Amino acid sequence: MLDLKRIRTDFDTVAAKLKNRGVSEDTLTHLKELDEKRRTLLVQSEELKAERNIASAAIAQAKRQKEDATQQIADMQKVSADIKTIDNQLVAIDQQVADIITVLPNTPHDSVPVGADEEDNVEIRRWGTPRDFDFEVKAHWDLGEDLDILDWERGAKVTGARFLFYKNLGARLERALYNFMLDEHIKEGYQEIITPYMVNHDSMFGTGQYPKFKEDTFELADTNFVLIPTAEVPLTNYYRGEILDGKELPIYFTAMSPSFRSEAGSAGRDTRGLIRLHQFHKVEMVKFAKSEESYQELEKMTANAENILQKLGLPYRVISLCTGDMGFSAAKTYDLEVWIPAQNTYREISSCSNTEDFQARRAQIRYRDEADGKVKLLHTLNGSGLAVGRTVAAILENYQNEDGSVTIPEVLRPYMGGETVISPK
């Protein structure tokens, strides 16, 4: 959530930055007007309360002296009624302010490219060279069926579209991947966490999914619970409402969890395969850092995600998302896109973002600075390290062989009991 004081004191800068994120200046102008009206009413309310205190003292004095206080009582009742009217106005204005400010996206960092959509994203670097196949490549969904490791038909029967069963060496490959990813992140200083897979609405608000993106989630009927769309939500909210010791920062968390997404608005996109599912595993990274360290920590986090792809030998590229393509809470985002041979293109496999103090303000996560003793909002960062199903897809396609088998990447073999290849039955 943005700082209302910043909007008030640096309106033009904030308006220009949010314009690049699709927010009209009229919206901010209305917010500023509401804020000014609210501040005026607060002054009036305080003045009236002072009048009421004076009147109350005068009434008490008159009663002690057994004088008629009828007029003073009438005056005080009128002042009290005026205060109640103003308080009701303030409640209404506070709600209007909340309705606006809670759905305003974060302001982009100055280094973020300005653009409307993914066409305006900027490639930063590439790693690896896509393999030159001398046979016709298969899509990962066909490989999965031929190898009897992915069962789409029964997934659809048991649950519905965009669900599947992993089986045999497919299940072992999925498990090997997330164990490998977790081990790599632990080496980099991340604390492993097993989170709840349901969170409450306050947690969804804290990380920015609520109230704006409710349609993208699965809520449990007649409860305050939501199935997590990513482990970012419980990990970030771990410290919600707390004040941390500045000496402890930065703090690194990692977790593997299922992610549940309704994929609202994705009808017709990626209807086959592992790219877009309602339920998938993902290894998440979350950091809590001081403001002066957070962008260095973003570079480190991105490197941690890249490390996984490099050790798996999967070609990828790093993209800096433009203002029009970033997520709601992000101030800056790098996407990692892995090479998918059957589609002859790169597809997103990780997003690493610095939200600065946007989530921390919503969730009230603060720290006490050891230098000056002041309590300050910290910065939160999050990143995929990696989306496991999409990594399975990338391995199946990039490591496929002409005979229909798939070679298992060397780093995963110790996690799969020494297996070296997945062969057709």
Swiss-Prot record:
Where on this chain does ATP bind?
261-263, 348-351
Q: Which reaction does it catalyse?
A: tRNA(Ser) + L-serine + ATP = L-seryl-tRNA(Ser) + AMP + diphosphate + H(+); tRNA(Sec) + L-serine + ATP = L-seryl-tRNA(Sec) + AMP + diphosphate + H(+)
Q: In which pathway does it act?
A: Aminoacyl-tRNA biosynthesis; selenocysteinyl-tRNA(Sec) biosynthesis; L-seryl-tRNA(Sec) from L-serine and tRNA(Sec): step 1/1
GO CC terms: cytoplasm
Give GO terms for biological process. selenocysteine biosynthetic process; seryl-tRNA aminoacylation
Cited Gene3D superfamilies: Bira Bifunctional Protein, Domain 2 (3.30.930.10), Serine-tRNA synthetase, tRNA binding domain (1.10.287.40)
Compartments reported by the entry: Cytoplasm
The answer to keyword Ligase applying to this record is yes
Q: Name one GO molecular function term.
A: ATP binding
Pfam families noted in UniProt: Seryl_tRNA_N (PF02403), tRNA-synt_2b (PF00587)
Q: Which domain of life is it from?
A: Bacteria
Q: Which residues bind L-serine?
A: 230-232, 284, 384
Q: What UniProt keywords apply to this chain's record, in alphabetical order?
A: Aminoacyl-tRNA synthetase, ATP-binding, Cytoplasm, Ligase, Nucleotide-binding, Protein biosynthesis
NCBIfam families membership: serS (TIGR00414)
The record's listing under PANTHER family reads: SERINE--TRNA LIGASE (PTHR43697:SF1), SERYL-TRNA SYNTHETASE (PTHR43697)
Q: What is known of its domains?
A: Consists of two distinct domains, a catalytic core and a N-terminal extension that is involved in tRNA binding.
User: Which protein family is named in the record?
Assistant: Belongs to the class-II aminoacyl-tRNA synthetase family. Type-1 seryl-tRNA synthetase subfamily.
Subunit comment: Homodimer. The tRNA molecule binds across the dimer.
Recorded protein name is Serine--tRNA ligase
**Species per Swiss-Prot/TrEMBL record:** Streptococcus pyogenes serotype M5 (strain Manfredo)
